[in-house]
């Protein structure tokens, strides 16, 4: 980003002022930068509301993507066996999935299962930036095409609890109607107006860009060395 290159300019100036030897390496990389994200929640008989959200690195884009919101209850069950995992992902097809699972493996398997999108809950009420890539950084040429680019956002803990309760209430109402033998006559959950629907809007800047990185060298008395590395970028202030 422009801010990232400005940070490199600053570091280079400081290195020069200190008389430290350095090289500024230029390269091209596949950059994924979240731009904007929101989740609008809809349920018959209740006013629509928008949940504050942030997209993850390597999320796909979504523009008015709408689908039934389902709660991934299995994400709270700990380690699952193969059959349990199959049953879990079978329920995701054509749905927007609400979950606490923020792993890349889950994201990848949810995409394979036909999920429309993922709304992940970060347990705390502070935004947590994440990546839906296999590593932090640019994917290798072999990995890049494996990324599903499924629309993915994270929401705050308190909003997640609210959505979980809404989805559970809708599912409980469906169970009651089914017990009365009404389900067959009325059709799907959505037809009864019991389903919670989510609309995902995600804007991303996923493209190849030119970037640079400073590498400073402070020589010692022997060929042995200590490699120090760290982030100089920041999502907000830094």
Question: Model regions: which residues?
Answer:
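Stable alpha-helical elements in mature extracytoplasmic
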Residues: 3-14, 103-106, 111, 159-163, ...
């Amino acid at each position: 980003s422009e801010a990232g290159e400005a940070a490199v300019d600053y570091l280079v100036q400081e290195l020069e002022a200190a008389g430290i030897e350095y090289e500024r390496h230029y390269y091209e990389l596949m950059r994924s930068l979240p731009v904007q994200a929101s989740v609008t929640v809809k349920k018959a008989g209740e006013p629509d509301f928008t949940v504050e959200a942030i997209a993850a690195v390597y999320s796909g884009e979504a523009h008015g993507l709408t689908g039934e919101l389902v709660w991934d209850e299995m994400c709270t069950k700990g380690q699952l066996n193969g059959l349990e995992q199959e049953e879990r992902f079978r329920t995701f097809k054509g749905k927007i999935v609400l979950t606490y699972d923020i792993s890349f493996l889950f994201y990848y398997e949810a995409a394979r299962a036909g999920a429309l999108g993922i709304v992940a809950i970060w347990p705390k009420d502070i935004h947590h930036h994440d990546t839906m890539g296999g590593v932090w950084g640019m994917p290798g040429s072999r990995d890049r095409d494996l990324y599903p680019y499924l629309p993915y956002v994270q929401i705050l803990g308190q909003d997640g609890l609210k959505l979980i309760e809404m989805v559970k209430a809708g599912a409980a109402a469906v169970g009651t109607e089914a017990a009365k033998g009404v389900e067959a006559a009325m059709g799907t959950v959505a037809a009864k107006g019991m389903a919670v629907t989510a609309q995902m809007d995600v804007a991303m800047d996923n493209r190849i860009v030119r970037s640079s990185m400073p590498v400073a060298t402070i020589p010692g008395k022997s060929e042995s060395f200590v490699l120090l590395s760290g982030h100089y970028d920041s999502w907000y202030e830094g």
